[in-house]
Amino acid sequence: MRLTPLPAFDNNYIWTLIAPDGRAIIVDPGQALPILEAHSKGLIPTAILLTHHHADHIGGVPELLERWPTLPVYAPHDTRIALNYHRIGEGDSLNILGMRFQVIHTPGHTHSHLTFIGNDLLFCGDTLFSLGCGQIFEGTPTQMLASLQRLAALPIQTRVCCGHEYTLSNAAFALHVDPTNTALQKRRQQANAMRLAGLPTLPISLESELNTNPFLRTAAPTIHAATATHLQRTPIDEVEVFATLRHWKNNFPIKNIP
């Protein structure tokens, strides 16, 4: 299976897993046009996976279903997803084109957010980003941290397929928090070169994220010290470290939406 991110909007990625015969699994098609263009080059939509209900992740589905009415769609139980789809949740598994996906519930960004894991690939929507994490629109810091910790416990060779190209803007905040992290400095340089070349910075290995993403390193002494300085007091616990980082990032001059 060939993994290909298709750019959409300003910074979204629609992830595709394409079999040798062109049949493809599509993750979070916020727009139909990139899929229709790929179809003109041989891609055959076979199934759609949706991580959450936000329009920039599901907006292209109605048009795709007009073109392929029997195309199966798998998504979380959420009344805001106004589609004919298969409702899935924590503990479910999917077998599509010979790939088995484990479904896990990762609340925080939204209440019903799902993540798909298969063949060492992690399709995490807006829960985990390269060098960052999603904003907490519906859940709590405790929920979001727990979701991130579940993902952090996966095998380090797991390749992280995020919903947005946010590496450089996230790197600016991460380096503000953790300026002496040499692995982080190197990642920023590599990401800058890739973007200048017009290349995606994703997927990224979970191992790299564990070494550089402050939202996955809330127990690290350097991150704890940075949040203590920001708060001007010692954080109560790891949840407060995380919540402080998230609030700090929300107000950082270089912002991501979401």
Curated annotation (Swiss-Prot):
NCBIfam families: GSH_gloB
Database matches in Gene3D superfamilies: Ribonuclease Z/Hydroxyacylglutathione hydrolase-like
Reactions mediated catalytically: an S-(2-hydroxyacyl)glutathione + H2O = a 2-hydroxy carboxylate + glutathione + H(+)
Name of the protein: Hydroxyacylglutathione hydrolase
InterPro entries listed in its UniProt record: Clx_II_MBL, Glyoxalase_II_hydrolase, HAGH_C, Hydroxyacylglutathione_Hdrlase, Metallo-B-lactamas, RibonucZ/Hydroxyglut_hydro
Pathway stated in the Swiss-Prot or TrEMBL entry: Secondary metabolite metabolism; methylglyoxal degradation; (R)-lactate from methylglyoxal: step 2/2
Residues that bind Zn(2+) 2: 56-57, 126, 164
Alphabetized UniProt keyword annotations: Hydrolase, Metal-binding, Zinc
Domain of life: Bacteria
Keyword presence, Metal-binding: yes
A single BP term in Gene Ontology: methylglyoxal catabolic process to D-lactate via S-lactoyl-glutathione
Quaternary organization: Monomer.
Needed co-factor(s): Zn(2+)
Cofactor details (free text): Binds 2 Zn(2+) ions per subunit.
SUPFAM superfamilies to which the protein is assigned, alphabetical: Metallo-hydrolase/oxidoreductase
Family: Belongs to the metallo-beta-lactamase superfamily. Glyoxalase II family.
GO molecular function: hydroxyacylglutathione hydrolase activity; metal ion binding
Entry EC no(s): 3.1.2.6
Cited Pfam families: HAGH_C, Lactamase_B
Keyword Metal-binding found: yes
Residues that, per the record, bind Zn(2+) 1: 52, 54, 109, 126
Purpose: Thiolesterase that catalyzes the hydrolysis of S-D-lactoyl-glutathione to form glutathione and D-lactic acid.
